[in-house]
Amino acid sequence: MRESVAVKHPVGHKASQADDVIKSFVRSIDTAKRSEQPYCNWSLQACFPADTVDDILALPFEAPSLEGVSGKRELHNNTRKYFDVENRKDFPVCEAVAQAFQDKRLTSHIVKMFGTNLKGTYLRIEFAQDIDGFWLEPHTDLGVKVFTLLLYLSKDPSHKDLGTDIYDGDKKHLCRSAFAPNAAFVFVPSNNTYHGFEKRPIKGVRTSLIINYVTNEWRAREQLSFPETPIT
C-alpha cells in the first residue's frame, strides 16, 4: 500500500471540494463559447475554483522524460498519471475532481449542453505534463471516447501559444485553441474532430487535464476513476 503524500499549501488556502468544482464547472459551461468550424467545439473559462487549480498544480508528480520519442501519448503509457483509484485515495484534489465529474448534477449538464450520451460510460482523467520535444499527430478521439475536455492549467506566460492545434477533415492545420490557465477546449468526438499538437518550444512543463468519458470497451481499466461504476 502506498503512503499518502502531504501537499503543503499557503495559509488561507481552501481545500478542494467536489461541490465547489461542480458549481464552478457548471458556470463555465453556461458561459461557454461555441464554434462550428471546422467542427463543433466549445471554449470554456474559469472552469475550476482557483484553489483547485493550485491543488492540481501542486501534485508531486514529476514530468516524465520523452526519451526522444513523441507523436502519440500511448508511446509513454508506463509513465502517464491519472486521477485513478489510488491517486483518489492519496490526494484530496484528485478525489474532489473525480467525484465532481461522476456526479449526476454535472454529467446531466454536460449531456444537455454538449449533446453527448454518457449513460454507461466511465470517467477517465489524465494529468498531462508535456515538456520540450512533445508533439501529437492529428487524431479524432473517435471510438471509445464519447466526450473530450482539454483543461489547461500551467501559468507560465510563455505557454499562451501552447493550445490545442485544430485540423480540417484532410488533417490540414487551421487554427489553435487559446491556452490560458483554467480555460478549456471541448468537443464530442466524431470522424472529423482532428486535433493534435504541432511541435514547438515548450518552456518548463505544459500542464493540463484530459477528461474523457469512455465506453465499456475501454481496456485499461486501471486508468479509470471509478472502474466499477458507470455513469447513470
List each language-model region with its residue ranges.
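Non-heme Fe(II)/2-oxoglutarate
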Residues: 21-24, 29-113
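Catalytic core of non-heme Fe(II) oxygenases with the double-stranded beta-helix
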Residues: 89-102, 106-228
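Membrane-targeting and insertion segments and their boundary/processing signals
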Residues: 13, 18, 22, 26-30, ...
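Intrinsically disordered, low-complexity regions
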Residues: 13, 69-72, 170, 205
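Intrinsically disordered, low-complexity segments enriched in small/polar residues
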Residues: 10, 66-69, 161, 194
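Short N-terminal signal/transit or membrane-insertion segments
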Residues: 1-22, 79-91, 139-142, 146-147
